[in-house]
UniProtKB/Swiss-Prot annotation:
UniProt lineage: Eukaryota, Metazoa, Ecdysozoa, Arthropoda, Chelicerata
Tissue spec. comment: Expressed by the venom gland.
Protein name: Potassium channel toxin TsTXK-beta/Cryptide TyPep-16
Organism: Tityus serrulatus
Disulfide bonds: C56-C77, C63-C82, C67-C84
Subcellular location: Secreted
A GO MF term: potassium channel regulator activity
KW Chaperone (keyword) present: no
A Pfam family that the UniProt record links to this protein: Scorpion_toxin_alpha-beta
Domain of life, per lineage: Eukaryota
Annotated keywords: Disulfide bond, Ion channel impairing toxin, Neurotoxin, Potassium channel impairing toxin, Secreted, Signal, Toxin, Voltage-gated potassium channel impairing toxin
Family: Belongs to the long chain scorpion toxin family. Class 1 subfamily.
Keyword Disulfide bond included in the entry's annotation: yes
Additional observations: It is not known if the sequenced fragment corresponding to the propeptide is the result of the post-translational maturation process, or if it has a biological activity of its own. The primary structure of this cryptide Pep-3 is identical to that of cryptide Pep-3 from other Tityus species (AC P0DRE8, AC Q5G8A6, AC P0C2F3).
Amino acid sequence: MERKLALLLILGMVTLASCGLREKHVQKLVALIPNDQLRSILKAVVHKVAKTQFGCPAYEGYCNDHCNDIERKDGECHGFKCKCAKD
């Protein structure tokens, strides 16, 4: 039962993360889970999924939106990650 719940939570959070929600929004949902090993695993999974930025090659303007949201700079897609402009 616990494995099924964990799998559902992971899949749900991956889905939310891939729908344009930022990591900070999904991590707030993870905070609702009781503090144990499952919570640590979910936090790591959400962080890794958010870090890969799969939307980068698929959606035009994704990196611009991402970099504007985080650093208030322009961004471009580099592989599967966004590169934000330097000063």
